[in-house]
């Protein structure tokens, strides 16, 4: 979903750039090579665009260099047993999977570790009104709502697909230290790397996360706000096999439980930074109890118990026993995987534009969103697909792949689509973070209406996938 | 032919399910499941009854239950859930009766203690903890307990504040309760009943008791969270201080003083 490494990755990069810019004007030029396309970032979006470019006959001969700050060694050899699941998991929509299949990536993804789901329940933690989605009713038999996939599994599949591709260089453990344009380079980007080399390129693609150095170098502003909320993720063990996704909207933020194979579940609990810190400090037993409380008890109850961890094991079982078995609530959680609890701040951010002359931004570099709709990674996949097609079309015509004219269709395709989604998610977050009884009443009425009017539900489902 | 039809068969369908009687299962033995309309009719009926005869404790209790749901009783339970003692009360669900409280033991407690003040107040007013009605119309069993606890604690509020059960005292306490618990019945009583007051009563109420009640009700900690059974030995003045309540002027004394002035 989000990559926490981007934050630490960033600041030194920006700092060094300025130093480099000021010292190199008089220094002799370092060794410069050319690569038609440079992709910065080895996350799902960056790897997908590389895989897509290597898939199309029009672009397969373009030289591509992928630069990643971290090490990809662990990702290449990744393959844990079925008793461990990663805590960074994304819900891939059918259209994301369709494209990954088309470019030959999906067959390299370990399908035993992917969990499809066909039911989804979301409900209001204050009023209890709910909406249920069920693909077998809505979109015909055989359709899934989405596929729960570990981000590592997807990246591992992408790297397998990219192995031994011609004209592709993957430089990991390498930092982008600066981007410069000079008259000698015909104003095309010169990417200065931490290994001392410089690459000139026709198209620089920034897939380098929420604090994208490429975006900063390109002078593209990204606007938005901090939700003052942290997303706590964890891998949990469920009492029995599940094929449903669950999300409960609490005033502090939504808590979602998504199914993984082998009775595992992926938990995303958005809450106040303070509460997230407290939840991470609980013992595994307390944490498991707390998660079960979060799906069953009143918001006040949950907040009290988090504040009084000593009472969790004594008071919470009684509180839970007072709730008669509610079919809308997921099955109990029985354990939390060791060291799987992590949290990160949630932000809404959208770049002013995705393209500039010889530059394109994709994925988190272009937009970040609240995880409540599970769309962050899918938006990046959509970007990669759209940008790859734009480049393919230009390459097929023999046009300049870096010109804004080439990149314009990508921007036109994705910008407003993403903007709409960011807006909807942002409003949903705000709508559900209040306890004002009038707002709660109205939103519950609205949710009940959505739940009972089939065409509205159909429309929402088609929008989500 | 008419004679052969037993009365019960004519009444039976009404008992099973009507516009007013909900057909959902009972959540606790004394529960009377109502529809929304049923609750509204009950509220209006008991409201009128209470307005014209405020001595009808049963009607006051019914009005309280009919107007507390939805929302208000849940808010009150939330106040209990926020407090360790309130949570313990919800878990243990103690009931107050003349037996569980052992009134004779309370009579022997030291002067000024909560228990002694409470029993003196009971004796002075000639009431008993057993005169409190059973909650029937609240749907959630836990909320029903909250209502029951509120009702049973009511006499302790009298003891805590020293307000008598004449109309003005009762009303001042209602206002205090409204500010403190948010239950609408208390608010209705506070606003509507003064319409029946004589001018002198009204002046006393608006000048002294209502401001006292609202100020202290809003300011003090939620009194629903007091575990009365455990603070019986405690000094009333000390408990008032803990909760942040000032004692109001003695209403009966004030009445006498005003009568003398004339």
Curated annotation (Swiss-Prot), chain B:
Keywords: Lyase, Membrane, Metal-binding, Mitochondrion, Mitochondrion inner membrane, Ubiquinone biosynthesis, Zinc. GO terms for cellular component: extrinsic component of mitochondrial inner membrane; mitochondrion. It is found in: Mitochondrion inner membrane. It is a peripheral membrane protein. The keyword Translocase does not apply. Residues 243-262 are annotated as: Disordered. Its main location: mitochondrion. It catalyses: a 4-hydroxy-3-methoxy-5-(all-trans-polyprenyl)benzoate + H(+) = a 2-methoxy-6-(all-trans-polyprenyl)phenol + CO2. InterPro entries: Coq4, Coq4_euk. Residues 252-262 have a biased composition (Basic and acidic residues). Its cofactor is Zn(2+). Pathway: Cofactor biosynthesis; ubiquinone biosynthesis. GO terms for biological process: ubiquinone biosynthetic process. It comes from the Eukaryota. Zn(2+) binds at residues 154-155, 158, 170. Its EC number is 4.1.1.130. This protein may be expected to contain an N-terminal transit peptide but none has been predicted. Belongs to the COQ4 family. Component of a multi-subunit COQ enzyme complex, composed of at least COQ3, COQ4, COQ5, COQ6, COQ7 and COQ9. Lyase that catalyzes the C1-decarboxylation of 4-hydroxy-3-methoxy-5-(all-trans-polyprenyl)benzoic acid into 2-methoxy-6-(all-trans-polyprenyl)phenol during ubiquinone biosynthesis. This is Ubiquinone biosynthesis protein COQ4, mitochondrial. It comes from Yarrowia lipolytica (strain CLIB 122 / E 150). The lineage of its organism: Eukaryota, Fungi, Dikarya, Ascomycota, Saccharomycotina.
């Amino acid at each position: 979903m989000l990559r926490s490494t981007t934050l630490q990755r960033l600041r030194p990069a920006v700092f060094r750039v300025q130093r480099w810019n000021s010292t190199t004007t008089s220094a002799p030029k370092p060794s410069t090579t050319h690569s038609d396309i440079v992709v910065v970032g080895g996350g799902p979006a960056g790897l997908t665009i590389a895989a897509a470019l290597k898939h199309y006959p029009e672009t397969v001969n373009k030289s591509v260099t992928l630069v990643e700050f971290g090490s990809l060694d662990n990702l290449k050899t990744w393959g844990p047993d079925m008793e461990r699941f990663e805590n960074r998991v994304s819900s891939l929509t059918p259209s994301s999977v369709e494209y990954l299949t088309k470019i030959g990536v999906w067959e390299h993804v370990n399908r035993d570790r992917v969990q499809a789901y066909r039911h989804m329940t979301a409900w209001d933690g204050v009023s209890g009104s709910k909406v249920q989605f069920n693909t077998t009713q809505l979109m015909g038999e055989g359709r899934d709502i989405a596929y729960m996939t570990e981000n590592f599994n997807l990246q591992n599949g992408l790297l397998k697909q990219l192995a031994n591709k011609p004209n592709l260089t993957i430089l990991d453990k390498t930092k982008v230290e600066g981007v410069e344009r000079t008259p000698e380079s015909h104003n095309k980007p010169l990417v200065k790397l931490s290994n001392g080399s410089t690459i000139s390129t026709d198209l620089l693609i920034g897939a380098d996360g929420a604090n994208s150095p490429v975006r900063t170098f390109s002078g593209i502003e990204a606007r938005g706000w901090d939700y003052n909320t942290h997303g706590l993720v964890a891998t949990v063990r469920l009492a029995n096999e599940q094929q449903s996704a669950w999300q409960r909207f609490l005033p502090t933020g939504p808590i979602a439980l998504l199914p993984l194979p082998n009775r595992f579940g992926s938990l995303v609990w958005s809450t106040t930074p303070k509460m997230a810190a407290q939840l991470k400090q609980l013992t595994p037993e307390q944490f498991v109890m707390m998660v079960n409380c979060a799906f069953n008890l009143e918001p006040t109850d949950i907040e009290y118990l988090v504040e009084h961890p000593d009472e969790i094991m004594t008071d919470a079982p009684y509180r839970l026993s007072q709730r008669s078995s509610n079919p809308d609530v997921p099955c109990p959680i029985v354990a939390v995987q060791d060291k799987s609890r992590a949290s990160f701040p949630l932000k809404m951010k959208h770049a002013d534009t995705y393209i500039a002359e010889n530059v394109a931004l994709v994925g988190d570099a272009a937009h970040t969103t609240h995880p409540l709709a599970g769309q962050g990674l899918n938006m990046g996949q959509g970007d990669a697909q759209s940008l790859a097609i734009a480049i393919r079309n230009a390459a097929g015509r023999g046009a300049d792949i870096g010109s804004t004219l080439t990149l314009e269709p990508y921007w036109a395709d994705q910008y407003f689509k993403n903007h709409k989604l960011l807006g909807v998610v942002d409003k949903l977050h705000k709508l559900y973070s209040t306890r004002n009884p009038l707002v709660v009443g109205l939103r519950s009425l609205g949710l009940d209406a959505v739940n009972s009017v089939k065409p509205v539900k159909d429309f929402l489902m088609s929008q989500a996938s | 032919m008419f004679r052969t039809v037993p009365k019960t068969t004519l009444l039976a369908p009404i008992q099973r399910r009507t516009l007013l009687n909900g057909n959902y299962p009972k959540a606790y033995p004394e529960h009377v499941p109502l529809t929304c309309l049923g609750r509204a009719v009950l509220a209006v009926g008991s409201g009128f009854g209470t307005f014209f005869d405020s001595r009808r404790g049963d009607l006051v209790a019914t009005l309280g239950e009919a107007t507390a749901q939805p929302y208000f009783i849940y808010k009150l339970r939330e106040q209990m859930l926020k407090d360790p003692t309130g949570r313990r009360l919800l878990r243990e669900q103690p009931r107050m009766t003349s037996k569980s409280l052992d009134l004779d033991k309370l009579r022997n407690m030291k002067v000024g203690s909560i228990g002694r003040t409470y029993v003196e107040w009971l004796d002075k007013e000639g009431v008993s903890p057993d005169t409190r009605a059973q909650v029937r119309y609240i749907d959630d069993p836990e909320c029903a307990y909250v209502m029951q606890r509120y009702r049973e604690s009511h006499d302790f509020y009298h003891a805590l504040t020293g307000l008598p059960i004449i109309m003005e005292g009762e009303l001042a306490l209602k206002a205090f309760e409204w500010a403190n618990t948010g239950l609408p019945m208390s608010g209705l009583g506070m606003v509507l009943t003064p319409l029946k007051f004589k001018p002198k009563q009204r002046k006393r109420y608006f000048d002294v008791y209502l401001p006292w009640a609202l100020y202290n009700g809003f300011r003090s900690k939620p009194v629903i969270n007091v575990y009365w059974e455990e603070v019986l030995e405690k000094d009333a003045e000390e408990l008032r201080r803990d909760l942040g309540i000032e004692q109001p002027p003695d209403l009966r004394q004030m009445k006498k003083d005003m009568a003398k002035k004339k």
